[in-house]
Amino acid sequence: MIRFEDVSVTYDGAATPTVRNIELDVPEGELVLLVGPSGVGKSTLLGAVSGLVPHFTGGTLSGRVTVAGRDTRTHKPRELADVVGTVGQDPLSHFVTDTVEDELAYGMESLGLAPDVMRRRVEETLDLLGLAELRERPIATLSGGQQQRVAIGSVLTPHPRVLVLDEPTSALDPAAAEEVLAVLQRLVHDLGTTVLMAEHRLERVVQYADQVALLAGPGAPLLLGAPAEIMAVSPVFPPVVDLGRLAGWSPLPLTVRDARRGSGELRERLAGHEPRQPHEQPQTAASPASRRSRLRSGRQPEVPAVAEVAGLAVRRGRVEALRHVDLSVGPGEIVALMGRNGAGKSTLLSTLVGLVRPSSGTALVGGAVPHRTGPRELIRRVGLVPQEPRDLLYADTVAAECAAADHDAGADPGTCRDLVSRLLPGIADDTHPRDLSEGQRLTLALAIVLTARPPLLLLDEPTRGLDYAAKARLVTVLRGLAADGHAVVLATHDVELAAELSHRVAVLADGEIVANGPTPEVVVASPAFSPQVAKVLAPGKWLTVAQVREALESAGLAEDGA
């Protein structure tokens, strides 16, 4: 169905090809997962299937790419639209209408389908993706994850024979991601749809793949094989595979269920050991009752909170986005906000940075009211890395972005560039931000915000588009900031990140905080927000492979060579 024959792609101005001598054959009715580190050319390969590369992106494509027998060099994207449906990393770039229902119908209108067929397919897709309640909502009012589901639905309604998906679950909460992947699996198994998908969150998707295609590095040859075989040699792999490598399991498990079945011996080796938390929770501002108790006992009061929210409510049009929210974040504390798409996480961050005015209640950052504080003063108190990094990027080169960030923050020249070098090794000064991958743009935006070293750092889906190595670098930077006394609040659907990094997790649902406590207590008790290691080794409090590795090594129990 999809065939690459000796394909190389070189973009205008590039000295070397982004991908080189690619050979790939995807049979009809299979789901093939494309994996590899950030920046190796995965999005380029996906774009070549839909014809966007080179017709839209420019550059030179040598070799041959065919989809259902059509050569993408001689067929422009509009001539492939009846065969190929594409969802890129940025859902906003897909939308051409204003409301959810209209967007789902647009692709079918373009193909001239009958009105009764269009109506039936729209209803089916609304139900399949859990969008029925949003059918009349303006797309601009949806959360990032809801927009991503609409983008996926808009390519499902025309019933293409081939689906090309770039990070389709990156902005989805765990439950919504499972729903989308279940729909894709049904299309593959029942309708014979061919799916080529790139995804960094392998813990979500690798078990659904018929085959895995690995691009290990820029210009590297493509390896294609069974998921377990490729995961054994891949530089990127999910926690359950990492745990299997550590424990010496063969074959490597791809699912929590498989890992649990083989975990008996590992449980015995861990018996009597307790996971060491990678960092202790710092002193934070406590509740009024706790303060009175401490004063009566003569102990020192807590350090003042960097951010404090009390009785906060926010209305956005007819939607009550937040209600009765109480949250306090102290210096050096890392708090993860979790919850379904549309639960109010991004709204809470926007309120703390002054973009949204509360309907009632209070929000204070460093003692100041955010929406009443001027930008130059606010930037020294709080910084936000938004879901869409392009909101912060406007210059033509990475060097210009960094120079502007240094100037705005009053930092020494080179401060931002040094951060970029730590987070994004190998990115040249003259690189245009639009030429970076989604994850790389997000990391550049993070470096720009960190230049001012604000006491409070807010991050909205900070690992979207990041591979495991980039995520590890991000964790190191954020831990360093917390150790220096900076408070970090991140809204995330990445349960593995929350388990590894955060001191505390607050779960939001329908605009309210329904759980708020130490990370192990909150995530282990939640099937939706529990990391893979916790599920495998439950009811223990193990959250990460690093904790297991440390326990085994301290007892001299690790496998040789693990």
PLM segments and residue spans:
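ABC ATPase NBD Q-loop/coupling interface
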Residues: 10, 53, 64-79, 362-377
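Conserved ABC ATPase "signature" region
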Residues: 117-134, 411-429
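Conserved ABC ATPase "signature" C-loop
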Residues: 218-219, 511
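Helix-to-loop junction immediately C-terminal to a conserved catalytic motif
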Residues: 50, 353
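ABC ATPase C-loop
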Residues: 155-156, 450
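H-loop/switch region of ABC-family ATPase nucleotide-binding domains
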Residues: 199-200, 492-493
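Catalytic Walker B motif of ABC-type/P-loop ATPase nucleotide-binding domains
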Residues: 163-166, 457-460
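ABC ATPase nucleotide-binding domains
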Residues: 228-296, 529-562
